[in-house]
């Protein structure tokens, strides 16, 4: 958990420094002496909740929930924020939770954000807190796992809430804690995620916002840059329509599986041959192919689900 503590500490320092600087009308962080004092206090507070961070993260990891279905997760988070004396709003963008910590003044208002949802992935490790949860995704029963680190993010933001709540009387501003559902995308036919949270006004009056994502980088490092740092993602569906026939007489129909295979290979030439990868990093992935019911019957159609990521 040491890397989680380090990143939690970074978020806390960013939030407190931003509030202090904005309150003073500055564009830079507070003076060096003040920053050192803040640094030491945050270090002490963060180390004091180490055991809680481990407990929260393992509990959340053992009970993952899919997008727009984060019901237990929301209850755990809301109960924690209420225990800290915050004003808590639930059911934001379906299952989102927002906590408000009033400091010495309403503004500057700095927001800290975490995602909440898990992925339709079966966990394959033998740990006491490994997920055994099953869920439904695209009409199929699937394993559910926090395979993208959102359990870490939630534990860190719960920790940030606890530390900052203990310093509320000294914060020259206020803090909003945003727990966002459906970061992985809402179920088909539903709204959700960041867009719905913004639509419902979660960022109203917010002066600055911070978020992070865990990454398998060197311990004790934080990566950042001006502008975009994470890739944007768009999903797509392709349906190839053929004509059913027996596998013994493929010339009697149109084989959509062969066509689908050509499409999969052809798509890979877009990022590798049509885009300058030194200027426009991009990836195209086909994550699901579904078609046919028997080994010797050429089906009528094949459906593919894919994802493209690009840095803009």
Language-model regions: role of each:
Residues 92-96, 281, 299-301:
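Short Gly/Ser/Thr- and Asp/Glu-enriched loop/turn motifs at secondary-structure junctions
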Residues 7-20:
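Bacterial N-terminal signal peptides
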Residues 311-312:
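Conserved small/polar residues in nucleotide/adenosyl-binding loops
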Residues 101, 240-242, 308:
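Hydrophobic beta-strand positions in extracellular immunoglobulin-like domains
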Residues 28-146, 152-176:
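Acidic/His- and Gly-rich active-site-bordering loop/insert found
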Residues 134-145, 151-152, 163-164, 169-288, ...:
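Histidine/acidic-residue-rich, glycine-tolerant segments that coordinate divalent metal ions
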Residues 21-27:
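Boundary at the C-terminal end of the N-terminal hydrophobic targeting segment
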Residues 1-6:
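N-terminal secretory signal peptides that target proteins for export/translocation
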């Amino acid at each position: 958990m040491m890397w989680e503590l380090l990143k939690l500490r970074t978020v806390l320092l960013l939030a407190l420094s931003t509030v202090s600087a904005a309150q003073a009308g500055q564009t830079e962080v507070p003076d060096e002496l003040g920053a050192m004092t803040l640094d030491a206090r945050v270090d002490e507070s963060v180390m004091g909740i180490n055991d809680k961070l481990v407990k929260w993260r393992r509990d959340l990891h053992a009970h993952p929930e899919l997008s727009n279905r984060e019901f237990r997760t929301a209850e755990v988070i809301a109960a924690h924020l209420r225990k800290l004396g915050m004003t808590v709003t639930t059911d934001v963008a379906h299952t989102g939770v927002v906590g408000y910590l009033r400091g010495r003044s309403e503004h500057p208002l700095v927001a800290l954000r975490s995602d909440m949802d898990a992925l339709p992935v079966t966990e394959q490790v033998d740990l006491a807190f490994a997920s055994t949860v099953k869920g439904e995704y695209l009409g199929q029963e699937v394993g559910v796992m926090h395979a993208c680190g959102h359990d870490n993010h939630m534990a860190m933001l719960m920790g940030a809430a606890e530390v900052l709540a203990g310093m509320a009387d000294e914060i020259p501003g206020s803090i909003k804690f945003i727990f966002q559902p459906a970061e992985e995308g809402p179920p088909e036919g539903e709204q959700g995620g960041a867009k719905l949270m913004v639509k419902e006004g979660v960022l109203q009056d917010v002066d600055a916002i911070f978020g992070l994502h865990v990454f398998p980088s060197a311990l004790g490092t934080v990566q950042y840059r001006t502008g975009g740092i994470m890739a944007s993602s768009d999903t797509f569906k392709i349906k190839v329509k053929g004509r059913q026939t027996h596998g013994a007489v493929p010339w009697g129909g149109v084989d959509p599986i062969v066509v689908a295979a050509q499409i999969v290979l052809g798509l890979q030439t877009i990022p590798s041959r049509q885009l300058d990868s030194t200027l426009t990093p991009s990836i195209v992935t086909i994550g699901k192919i579904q078609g046919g019911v028997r080994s010797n019957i050429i089906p009528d159609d094949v459906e593919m689900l894919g994802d493209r990521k690009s840095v803009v």
